[in-house]
Amino acid sequence: MKKRYSSLLLIVTQVLYAQETIQTDRPDQTESTSITPKSNLQLESGFFYEKTDTESRNISHPTLLIKYGVNKNLELRVGTDFNSETVYQERNSGISPITLGFKAKLMEERKLMPSLAFLGQVTLNSLASKNFKTPYTAPSIRLLFQHTLSDKLNLGYNLGAEWNGVTPDVTGVYTVSTSYSFDEKLGMFAEFYGYLNKFEKADHRFDAGFTYLISNNFQVDTSAGIGISKISPDYFVSAGVSYRFSTK
């Protein structure tokens, strides 16, 4: 009887695990507090186009983020992009500096208290194509917060600091994003985010987009946004896919 009960419990556990849907950090700029499940590998990739002015544009084709779940509270990450930049008819293409990092869950959501996670990353200036190498290694840190407002509505926000690798100056980062689920597959988000540097004017932006679950482990997305500040890009668009699989 005990053996039969144990087998039934194992089946139920496997079914519940299989029903857990993929949680991604794209397409918005707000990093979620979710951790990739243990022993799972998650790939998030996409296309990104940004127009800054009449003479400047940037295309990432593709962007790539790889995440691996170490345990329920920790994931490891590596990311890079293949970029094509055009400035005054001069075009450069190549691989952006590789970024290594981790995300650690610090606190689960409790009543009015949000779930909390920490994201730490470092962009290695020398691991890039010749035209995209930077003078400095560029670390970044963020505190990630998330509130469940209802069974369909969530609020996420980040606060952090980052370095761009071009100068030694630090830039403050903030993001605020709301996401809404129409049903089990279709969702949308709207977001404000920005960058604050004492040596430059503030850069504030707005974006919005949609996500669609093909399966529990496969999601597609699309988004677009505009710059709000004078130094911000005119507009940007993105589309991508995310896929998760177990390595066991």
Residue ranges of model-derived segments:
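Bacterial Sec-dependent N-terminal signal peptides
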Residues: 1-23
